């Protein structure tokens, strides 16, 4: 294998998506990483048992990357990009995770919290998401139900459901209060998120303290799942319509993201002649774009070959 290029060291230890280009500028591969530097560095490691990757790496002439605010955002960015264009070394259109939403029904008679594959408006019902990874989202719902037993709070509960609600601390809590608590977490309100994670962590530690290790492991999975669904991400927004291009530039490199109906659909980079760094985007996009324009300029100055 060729020596590990200097461009790898320029990548941050942060989640994001990356792509490799050949010397003609063609995109060879798009991937995602929980830690960009470590993941991309692995392509210059031991590939003896990965012949297809060895062939690809001989063609790589440039590295590009988008730093994301979370691993969940990176997963969505990869999925959205691969749905529109499948580079020759990618094998799966869109990715492996199944997109799902969370459905919160706060009706007093039959409140429910669960997964939904589509948004179907109904009185008293809110949808959150979409999220990637049905198993993770199901675990997040389990964790939230553990703290806020909405499904066991209606007046038509069985004796078993009433007992479960009592054990989970929701026996006398009104449905509206439980639903509001769940919505606050899923709306990513900082205090609500911190309180929910702290409560699950306390239960995990208590289970471990009594050597209930399977229960503690399950709680740890629920903690990680709640963190997944509340993680910041802007590259897939439900309900947004219309087209929008957001751009940033610096050091002769311009980064342009094309957003279509709330989803990132194209990621473009090109040289530019603007001497002063800048952005053209709504405020919520500016930090994201600025850091990625700066990274694009650093990587452009460090070709692989």
Task: Indicate where each model-derived feature is located.
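Conserved catalytic/ligand-binding micro-motifs in nucleotide and anionic cofactor chemistry
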Residues: 1-305
């Amino acid at each position: 294998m060729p020596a590990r290029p200097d461009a790898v060291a320029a990548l941050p230890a942060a989640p994001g998506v990356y792509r490799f280009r050949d010397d003609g500028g063609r995109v060879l591969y798009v991937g995602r990483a929980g830690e960009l530097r470590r993941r991309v560095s692995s392509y210059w490691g031991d590939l003896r048992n990965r012949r297809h990757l060895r062939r690809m790496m001989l063609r790589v002439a440039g590295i590009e990357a988008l730093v994301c605010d979370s691993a969940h955002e990176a997963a969505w960015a990869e999925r959205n990009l691969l749905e529109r264009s499948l580079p020759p070394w990618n094998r799966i259109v869109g990715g492996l995770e199944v997109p799902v939403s969370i459905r919160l029904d706060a009706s007093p008679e039959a409140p429910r919290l669960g997964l939904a594959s589509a948004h179907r408006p109904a009185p008293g019902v809110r949808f959150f998401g979409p999220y990637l990874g049905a198993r993770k989202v199901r675990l997040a719902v389990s964790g939230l139900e553990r703290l806020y037993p909405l499904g066991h709070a209606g007046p038509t509960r069985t004796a078993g459901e009433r007992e479960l609600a009592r054990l989970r601390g929701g026996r006398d809590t009104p449905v509206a209060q439980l639903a509001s608590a769940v919505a606050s977490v899923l709306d990513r309100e900082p205090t609500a998120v911190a309180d929910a994670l702290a409560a699950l962590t306390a239960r995990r530690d208590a289970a471990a303290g009594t050597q209930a290790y399977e229960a503690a492991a399950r709680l740890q999975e629920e903690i990680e799942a709640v963190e997944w669904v509340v993680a910041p991400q802007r590259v897939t927004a439900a309900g947004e319509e219309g087209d929008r291009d957001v751009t940033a530039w610096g050091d002769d490199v311009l980064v342009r993201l094309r957003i279509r109906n709330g989803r990132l659909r194209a990621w473009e980079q090109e040289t530019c002649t603007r001497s002063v760094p800048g952005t053209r985007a709504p405020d919520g996009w500016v930090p994201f774009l600025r850091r990625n324009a700066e990274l694009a300029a650093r990587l452009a100055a460090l070709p692989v070959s």
